[in-house]
């Protein structure tokens, strides 16, 4: 990959984890995060944009930066998502909610990898990576459009329950 040899490949495979650890350490320094909704959406946007950057990168340095940002964006969004889920879920269903989250957390990425592999086989690896980043940002825009109040979530307010079909 990028003709960087074994050592370069090792650094590339570590860059995302390094970004996650650094972001996790930074976030842990704030006992009470403000503007959680905005921070969540910014971190998901960074994740998507960095994924696009990775797909377009032709140099080792740019790929390292992109992967570092992918890891950082993912770590921050995961921390905030888990915090919101814990604070907003009623006590009597928190265990079930956590179980559902774990199913998606453990199974979702593997399904995404199958999709990415199929797209890469049909259109090439760079297209697969770039289209994944674009899909992330498009999904983010759709969520903001459908639930704009989430952007303003600050940890104090109760989020409205989703509408049910009658």
Regions found by a protein language model. Name each.
Residues 1-166:
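C-terminal transmembrane bundle of multi-pass solute transporters/carriers
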